[in-house]
Amino acid sequence: ADALKMLTKEDITPTGADKFIYNLAPVIAFATVILMWAVVPFTPLHIGADVGIGVLYFMAVASIGTVKIMVAGWSSNNKYALLGAFRTIAQLLSYEVPLVLSLLIPVMLAGTMSLQGITEAQGGMWYLFIAPVAAFLFYVANLAETGRAPFDLLEAESEIIAGYNIEYSGFKWGMFM
């Protein structure tokens, strides 16, 4: 019901916004999510794309998220959106390093950067039990990257409501969520 309500809301573009880039930012946000799912092996037979460097591809596409945030904050021509973008990017970049380091453990254990190869290498025992510290670090870094509690400062309702996407509404706002 909430999704339907969001899709039917009026889509407003701010007066001083760079309209092309303002409209491009939600598309970049949605495209990065779809591109990340392309290399995830669901079953041995259902793989979008089995690239040999799946982990590197996954992290590179995830890093594009900082670009979409900066574009969204800057293109709306709102100083609060820009400040929210700066704050969000600072948080995302600070947790990027632990996320990459925790992903290196399964890569080293499996001897491959292919997500399919890493999945197959865990046939006997999951790496969660072999490297619990790396698994916990990956979990915490992912909480921070996705903005879940206790790292939900990205929208900081007590400071700047909605952060970088303060000017977005309707369908465009939904593409960020």
Identify the residue ranges that each predicted region occupies.
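Selective transmembrane helix interface/packing segments
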Residues: A1-M177
